[in-house]
C-alpha cells in the first residue's frame, strides 16, 4: 500500500500530459532530450501569473556530411486556453547575428537582468503562437558547421533542411499555420526562405506534406540596400539633424548624387532577371551614412553623447559607436548564454561560446550571386500577405527608404500604393500607435516612438502585429479616421457587432485586394475552416480526457481513504523514517501543476548523461575594419586600447576608412578558418 500513492500520482501525471490538445501525435521520447525545464531565475522570477512557457532547445543536425547543426529555441504557451495551431519562425540578421537577440531582447518571453537571470517580458509573441528562434546561417550563435555558406539561395535550402529535421522532431505541428518574422538583414533571408517554401509546395515528392505558409513580417528590413541608403541624407535633413548650411553639405550632396546614379541604373535593369554587380555591391551608397554620422558629431557634448544613434535618432552614443553600445541590456545577454549551466540547460551538443555576431560568417556571406530580396516581393504577394513594419526612429533601415522602393515596385497589377495618402490609423489599447498602407497583399506599417528593434521598445504593441496579419482586429472610425483597432491580449470583444467587418480572408489579408486573387482567398478560407473544425474536435476530446482524469482522481482518493479506514488498528504502526519521507514527499507535491512544471522530471533523466565540457574561455571578438561594407559589421572603437569590437547587426557602413579588413579575435579564431569561395572568381581562398 505504501507504493500506491506515488504510483497513482505518476498515473495521473501521464494522463495529464496526454490530454494536452495541440500536442497530439507527438513523440515524447524523440523530443525529450530537447526539453528545457530550468534556467537561472526561471522559478524565482517568473510568477504563476506570467506562467512558465513550455520550452525545447538544442542543436539539430541538418547536414551530417558537413557537421552542420542549427540551434533552435522554441517557446509555447503553457496556458491551454490560449493554445493556437500557429508556428512563428523568428530570424535576426547581420548576416551572422544570433536570433537570441530576438529571443532575449525582443519577442521572447524573457529578458535578462544584471544578475544573468531570466525575468518576464509581458509582450512575448509566444502568447500568439509557438515561436521558434533559429541561429542561422551555420556558424551563427550556437549553430555550427565545418563549412560556411555564401549566398541567399543557400540560406533558403539550408532552412528547408532545418524544417525537415524540426518536423521530424515535432510531427504534430506540420499542419500548423506558419509565419516568418524577423528584422534587419532578415529582410533578405525571409523572402528567400518563403519563396523556397512556396516553390516546394508546388512540387511535393511522395510522402511530403505541404507547409502551410500564411505570411511574413519583416521589421526595419534591409530589403533594397542601395535604395535604402539613398534615403539617409533626406532623413537627416527632414528630422533636423543637418541642414543645407552645414559646411559639409556640398560633399554629402555629391555622394548622394553618385548613389542616385547607381539606383537609376538598377531601376533600368530591374526586371531583366540578372544579378548585376552594381546592385549587389552597396558600399558607395552606404558610405553616406558613415559620413553623416561623422559630420554631425557634437564634440562639445559628453564623450558618450557625441554621436547620433543610427538605430534611434532620438538617442546619442559615443563616436564612432553611434548606436552600437545599444540596447543597454545587450551586456547581460552574452554572459547569460555563456554560463556552462545554461549551455547544458539548452541541451547543447557542442558547448560553443556564444557571440552575438560571428565575423567569419559575415565575411564569408557575400551574397554576390543573389539578387536583393526586393525582387521576390511581387511573387510572394501573389500568394501570401507581406507585412513590412518600421520603427519611426530608425535611421539605418528607415521608413522613407522602405516607402521609396515600394512606390517603384509593381505587384499584383499595379505599381506602388495607389492610395498613398489614404493612410489607415493603427490603434492599440485605445492609443494611436502608428499608421499603415495596405494594398494588394503588401502592407507598410510605420510605428511611432520605436527604433530599429520595435519589439524591444514596444513589446505589447509589436505582438499585436500578429493580430493584424491574422485578421484579429476591428475596423472602426476613430476620431474621424479609418482605423484598425487591436487590443491587449485576451481583451478583444467577442460579440458579432464588434468583430472586424472584413473577416473573410480576402479582406483580412488585404482590405483593397482585387477579385483576381479569389483562388488564393478560397484556399485560405478552406484551410481556415479545416483548422477550425480540427480545433473544435480537439477541444471536445480534451474536455472528455479532463473529465476522465477528474473522475479517476476522485476514485483514487476514495480508494486510498477506504483502504486506510478498513485496516485493523492492530496492524497500523508508527511511521518509519522511510514511510514518513514518502508521506511528506507525496503531500508536498503541487496540486495545480503547470505543463512546464510537469516536465521538470525529464531533466533528471538526462543529468547523468550530460558532458563535462567547460565553457570556451576566450576574449570578446575584435574587429580591425573593412573596405567592402556591404552587409558587414561596423567596427566599434574601444576607448581604452584603440581596438574595434563586433557590432550588432547592420552597422555595416560605419567604419574607419583607414582600416582594410576585418580580423575577428574571438573563440572562432582558435578554430581552423572555414573553406569558402571568392564570390568574384569562384576560386578557393583561405
UniProtKB/Swiss-Prot annotation:
- InterPro entries, per this entry? AB_hydrolase_fold, Peptidase_S10, Ser_caboxypep_his_AS
Residue ranges, compositional bias (Basic and acidic residues): 491-500, 627-641, 674-686
Q: Which SUPFAM superfamilies match?
A: alpha/beta-Hydrolases
Where, by residue number, is the active site? 184, 394, 452
The positions making up the signal sequence are: 1-19
**Record-annotated membrane-spanning stretches:** 544-564
Q: What does this protein do?
A: Protease with a carboxypeptidase B-like function involved in the C-terminal processing of the lysine and arginine residues from protein precursors. Promotes cell fusion and is involved in the programmed cell death.
The protein, known as? Pheromone-processing carboxypeptidase KEX1
UniProt organism field: Candida dubliniensis (strain CD36 / ATCC MYA-646 / CBS 7987 / NCPF 3949 / NRRL Y-17841) (Yeast)
